[in-house]
């Protein structure tokens, strides 16, 4: 009887594990230095996902280098408008505070949902770069 209950519980929990999305806190990793930079909180608003910086790694100044007038990085919206389609997130924009440029964005869960591959690009996806957030 206990085995039957355990089996049923595992069977019912399986779809929940597969339904994991991108909502939550993600640690950004600088693709040039390999070091953590910030934590981005991704949340859903309607049918889109947006991300804002909620904390910074030690030693990272809380100022947006490209923002005019100057703004703090914490609270800055850096990811907007992603929409989920077949387990992938597309159609969004990502802001690079270092350059002040906004790029098209897409994202996809990787490594069993433990990391998020975020790609910023201009025009077509091959003209861009990918960061892996943890």
Role assignments for model-derived ranges:
Residues 121-134:
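Edge beta-strand at a domain terminus
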Residues 28-105:
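Central antiparallel beta-sheet cores of small beta-barrel/beta-sandwich binding domains
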Residues 17-25:
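N-terminal helix-cap/turn-to-beta initiation motif at the start of protein domains
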